[in-house]
Structures are given as structure tokens and as C-alpha cells.
Amino acid sequence: MPVEETSTPQKLPQFRYHPDPVGTGSIVADEVSCVSCEQRRPYTYTGPVYAEEELNEAICPWCIADGSAASRFDATFTDAMWAVPDDVPEDVTEEVLCRTPGFTGWLQEEWLHHCGDAAAFLGPVGASEVADLPDALDALRNEYRGYDWPADKIEEFILTLDRNGLATAYLFRCLSCGVHLAYADFA
């Protein structure tokens, strides 16, 4: 099929649950032909695609935003294996899975929730970035207390977090109350 050329500048779509996908690296400026809409687009998605068909070609952010890529390829952009609280409406989960750019983690990405809604993904962070966010630090501490880690080991682990390292935290913000949430993943 022929690729349709676009000549007017294109403003990136807005994503409620991933407000800065260029800043997080999930979308990059790279002119490509989108496999879904077959148009030349100035940006491409670099995050995970969960689909039966292996999709190695570029998907544009516009086809993620309008849900056409998810529909066309029976795909999601975040793994559906994470637990969604009962108070989160199904349409919110659908928006995160099918109309929001995902992100790449070390082992298993998960989308955090708060106040009956999905939280906004702000990006990977390290110890220096979470140092001034006591609510995010508390979330990390609580996560590792759940694994029965002693307090001193948790604090040592938090100090090793690096946004580009082998242990990384992923920062979110509640869209209702503004609390910062985080979880850590490591290789």
C-alpha cells in the first residue's frame, strides 16, 4: 500500500496518563511510515507492544492516541498482568492499555493507581530524583517492606537507584490528589 505524505506540522496528541512521552523516551522524534495508518509521521513510539503478531515496524503516537493501532493489531502498550484496584473503572484500564504509550522497564512494567484512577507516568528516576519526594520514597519503602527487607537494606537499595542503571524507580503522580507514587525494578 502507498504511504500517504503529510506536509503540515503535526502536534503530538495529549496522553492523560503519560503526559510527557517524549521526555520519558517512549516517543522519539524520528520520521517514519506508521504501520497502522501508513502515513509519514515525525514521531514514533519506542515502548513495548503486546500483541500476538510481532510488530517490529513503527507505530505513530496518533494511532496509539485514537486506539486504531490497538484495534488493528489487537495490541496493548502496557502489559495487562498488573493488578488493577477494584475502584478503577474499566474504561480507565482500557485507556492505559490501548490508548496510552507504555514504557520499558527491566523486568515487568506496572501502571500504578491512586484515588480510583490510573496515575500519570512521569518517567524513570534514580535516587537523586526521588530524594525530594517523600511520598515516592514512602511508596518505595513500603514496596520492599512487603518483601521483608530490613530497613537498612531498603535505604541502601534506594541509594543505588539510577534512572539509567541496573536498578531504576518509575515515578507516577495521582491525577486527583497529586501524591507521587513509585516502584522499583532491577535487572
Curated annotation (Swiss-Prot):
Entries under InterPro entries matching the protein: UPF0167
| Superkingdom of the source species | Bacteria
Q: What happens when the gene is disrupted?
A: Grows normally in liquid culture, traffics into host (human and mouse) acidified compartments early after phagocytosis, suggesting it no longer arrests phagosome maturation as well as wild-type, impaired growth in mouse macrophages.
Q: Transmembrane segments in this chain: where?
A: none
Q: What is one Pfam family matched by this protein? A: UPF0167
**GO terms classed as biological process:** symbiont-mediated suppression of host innate immune response
Q: What does this protein do?
A: Probably plays a role in host phagosome maturation arrest.
Q: Which family does it belong to?
A: Belongs to the UPF0167 family.
Name-wise, this protein is: UPF0167 protein Rv2295
